[in-house]
Amino acid sequence: MDTRFYNRYKDLLSKLDYTYRGYNIGCLIPGYLTCMFTDDAVTGRDVFKGFYEGVKFTNLSQVLQTEKSTVITYLINRKDYGDLAESVRKTYPDSDVTCLETLDKVGYSPFGISYISHLLKAFRIIFSRSVKESFTTKLYLVAILTNLFNQVKYLDKVLCPPNVKKYICFNSAYKEESLLTLYFKKHKVETISLQHGVFCDFKQMVPFDIINMDNLIADKLMCWGQSTIDYLKTKGFDESRFILAGNSKYKDAEIGHVDQSFSKCLVLLGRSVYIPSNDKLLALLMEFNRKHGNKILFYLKKHPFVVDSEHKAFASIADNLFFVGREHSVQEVLRSDLVDFTIAVNTTAYYESLALGKISLRWSDSENEDFYGMDDKFYDLAGLENKINYFKLKPESEIRREMKEVIKYVFNPELK
């Protein structure tokens, strides 16, 4: 397995063990280190953008303007993220939900004493600790650290409301939510991170997503299923840190009738690191429909973080391949009659499909994430044809039973 990027990331983190105002920088910076997980060089433009945007930062003090006992946050203004955060409110009704991306920006003047002292501190750390990166990358890291020092100083001076007893975030391993997690821990408030993806071993390379486990700094993790607890225990986590809660968006889901017609498919494409694998699958689907007379209508759903220009060459009316707009969530499409099965590429949306009674086939060429699931993997055109025929002929009751076993273990322990 390729661990180059992960080793590079860990080496850098070992040089950033530095505490400022009671906050360990090694716990705050991982979410900003995507540059460690790529061969693409940091450019002068990246450095300029880092310093330019770093003058301003999110006013996290607005999160503290609440009379509720529980604060819930999510970082990125995406509908599915918001839906997950809002669904948690059912368990903690005395709560406020805030999208951090929508908050105001504040900052320190780049000519002020605070900014300059933080800039010098960042330079000293990066250039005196044998960081094994290019000069340009070091400057980029200085920009990140300067911004983090600014954020820490600004937030740390804000009084924590005594009424707040619990902080629940979308991902304590990432960016501003890491800072809020450490802030609340410093003020003896219980911190909880939501599970938003599957924790698993990797087969080919260690991606940036590893930070979700490595930097899980919240006191507790609200887990989807027993599979998460079993896996993280093997990685040294104490069982007392886990709350078995299920995926709150799918607690009402039931697996009833399983459609075995295989006529309308939602293709759940993988994130940016899996673009080559996505392309191979889309070419295969074109080949399938040309061979079988456009037998299946394929709706293509890009990962939200994949830019619009990717995969556009595969949109084809002639081959029955159509893209689904970003305004339509995966859950929305799966709960409709638009599709009767799915194909998944290295994505936990695989479980969303099963949870709603839709058969899901897993494209496993270049598979990197070792998900627990059904006997539904295929690697080529013949494999796709075989799996479709296999599930068409399999008794519906057996498919439903296997779906329930997977979902109860991974996604929804309360599934009936």
Where are these regions (language model features)?
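Catalytic-core helical/loop segments in enzymes performing group transfer/polymerization on anionic/lipid-linked
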Residues: 1-416
